[in-house]
Amino acid sequence: MMHNKSKAIQDLYPDELAHCYGCGKNNLDGYQLKTYLVGDETIAHFLPDEKFTALPGSVYGGLVASLLDCHGTGSAAAFVCVQENINLNEVETIPVRCVTASLKVDFKAPTPMGVELKLRGKLQSIEGRKIWVDMTLSADDTICATGEILAIKIKD
Ligand SMILES: CCCCCCCCCC(=O)SCCNC(=O)CCNC(=O)[C@H](O)C(C)(C)COP(=O)(O)OP(=O)(O)OC[C@H]1O[C@@H](n2cnc3c(N)ncnc32)[C@H](O)[C@@H]1OP(=O)(O)O
């Protein structure tokens, strides 16, 4: 799905920091999740294939958690860029990379297979190198999981 409001955050990570299985553009075997800044929130989409099955017809929770993980670190990087007045459409790379210190996931409803999942992120707060982001993962109009991440901006 295309968004015209920003480049994907993960496509702006420097090459040497872009091998993450969940979101690295340089990991051809990975999920290559793409997080976009749209207004004051972040959006990503992912369509799981059937190898990620938990019970037949539903998606494995570990995948749900890893999507929230990578959307969370990407969202954190985007919100730091906003705070630092970095326009994501005017740069080739961003000088910001965040890693997960803590991730909380609440599974609210079974995540159905065969539906494009939508992830949304909202900034909760930034305090120095610590960024908290609240997230949802939805299928159609149902919130299947919520997440809260504490991401840490890695040192220069
Ligand atoms: C450098 C290579 C980068 C590669 C990028 C690829 C990332 C791909 C995305 C991921 O999937 S990340 C994978 C899962 N995460 C990890 O493997 C991270 C493992 N943990 C660490 O490497 C370090 O603990 C971490 C970088 C997160 C923090 O270490 P630092 O030495 O940079 O910072 P520090 O320990 O001083 O913590 C900074 C602040 O965060 C707080 N903090 C850290 N971990 C916390 C935690 N778990 N819960 C609550 N607070 C936490 C800590 O108390 C402190 O607060 P204050 O500044 O107020 O004192």
Segments (PLM) and residue ranges:
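HotDog/MaoC-like acyl-thioester-processing domains
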Residues: M1-D15, S102, A109-D156
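Non-catalytic linker/capping segments at the edges of enzyme domains
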Residues: M1-P56
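Short acidic/polar alpha-helix capping motifs at helix-coil junctions
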Residues: P14-A18, D69-C70, E84-N85, V96-V99
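A generic structural signal for short beta-strands and their flanking turns/coil linkers
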Residues: E16, Y31, D40-T42, G61, ...
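Short, solvent-exposed coil/turn segments
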Residues: L28, C98-T100, K130
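A conserved, well-ordered hydrophobic junction motif at loop->secondary-structure transitions
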Residues: I43-F79
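Hydrophobic residues in beta-strands and at strand termini
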Residues: F46-P48, F107, K153
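Hydrophobic beta-strand-centered segment that forms part of the acyl-chain substrate-binding groove
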Residues: S75-K118
